[in-house]
Amino acid sequence: ESFAVARPEKIFAETSPDGRVRLSFQLHTELEDILDCRAALEIREKETGKPVFSAAYPVKLGPGETEYMFDARVDSPELWYPAGYGKQALYELRLQIFSGMREVASFRHRFAFRSFEIEEKRFTEKQGLFQFRVNGIPVFANGGNWVPPDMLPGTVGRERLRHLIALAAECGYNYLRVWGGGYYESDDFYDLCDESGIMVWQDFMFGGPEVPEFDPAFRAECRREAEEVVCRLRRHPCICVWCGSNETDEFYLVDRNCKRERPGGYYYGWTLLHRDFPEIVRRLVPDAVYIPSCPFMGTAAPAGTENNAHGFGTCHTQWLPQFSPDEAFDRTVIPTFMNEFYGMCPVPASSVKRFLLPEDLDCYCNPVFSAHNMLEVQRNDEWGQIFRHLCFHDPRRRFDVPLAELLRGFEICAEELMTRYLALLRRNRKYCGGAG
């Protein structure tokens, strides 16, 4: 991007799978008079550099900010598909604006052609379907949740992101949910997902708490942030779902321990997630899919169905109940879309040895290790369930088994449990649209 007279902003190429392109952008100038200019637009295939469209348009530059919109068409475009379903075809446009022979502004913009929708069905009163369709093809979303790779965003560069995305692709991922308790990732992350065919479910960064939307200044700030995020990220074909928050509806509309009795029966933050954000997404990305919060009951569930009912919409659950006997396990209601598949497992012993002395590796109950164990602080029983399974329901064994050996057992246990549950989901793809 460059400019001598006009600064380009809010660039977006809205596309249709039939090859239509509508390029919109703003130009900001310090001019005092109108300037007659010419815009030259060229579109090329990103991989080969082959030109597929070119045209010129008259442009008038004026003082301040001016919005522009150009229409173009690419004949028989290649479509973008998630990994395992087709090619990740990308295109790049270049726009140059000239006053006479002088270039006054230019920019490049990468985009793709694809369609996306969510298919929902109801098979029984307890079992439905929630499934992605990309370019009309049903897709099983196979992936996980993306949490910040580091507490300090500035330490995560493109090469580290490339390594992590490559690991995800190597594991067979075609889907990542950017969890709403983290932060918005850099453009590098989304560029790499575009190139790798990894679909992205993008949460807005609201991780569960109520927020003071009744304060006009705070609400306006949240709206501005959402607009900036959508404008920055909307060009990426990898982003298929925009979601207002992580678990906020679940906390304050369903959970009996957190349910709020506010005026109108809503929690503080409901207006942002259910009115403001969907309006912003529809306005800035007209064909985008928006969901107010996850878990999400969906539209196919019978009236009165609770949020996070595993047979409809999206759900969050842990894999620890998979300790149950086979006959009970196989009677489980099949989750239609497992969007948060959690279960606590410790880091490898090699990592623990970086912050513990050898004498503190004697057993799990060592006070130094306990000081680093947040689950103990929270009195969370998830590790306790693994202990009961791993130690054959004899809690005294946690004092006898060396810590490194116990941590290795935890890893094996977690791997077996997740494998068992993922196998259940994959062999029931008639009902399950994805696992993250």
Q: At which residue positions do the language-model features occur?
A:
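Active-site mouth of glycoside hydrolases
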Residues: 31-32, 121-303, 435
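Short loop/turn segments at secondary-structure transitions that flank enzyme active sites
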Residues: 2, 117, 147, 248, ...
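Acidic, His- and aromatic-enriched active-site or binding-groove loops in soluble protein domains
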Residues: 202-209, 310-328
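Substrate-binding clefts and catalytic carboxylate motifs of secreted carbohydrate-active enzymes
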Residues: 242, 279-282, 291, 298-301, ...
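Secreted/periplasmic carbohydrate-active enzymes, especially glycoside hydrolases
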Residues: 1-176, 184, 195, 334, ...
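Short coil/turn segments at secondary-structure boundaries
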Residues: 9-12, 293, 353
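Short secondary-structure boundary/capping segments
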Residues: 257-260, 305-310, 352-356
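A generic "alpha-helical surface" signal
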Residues: 89, 133, 159, 220, ...
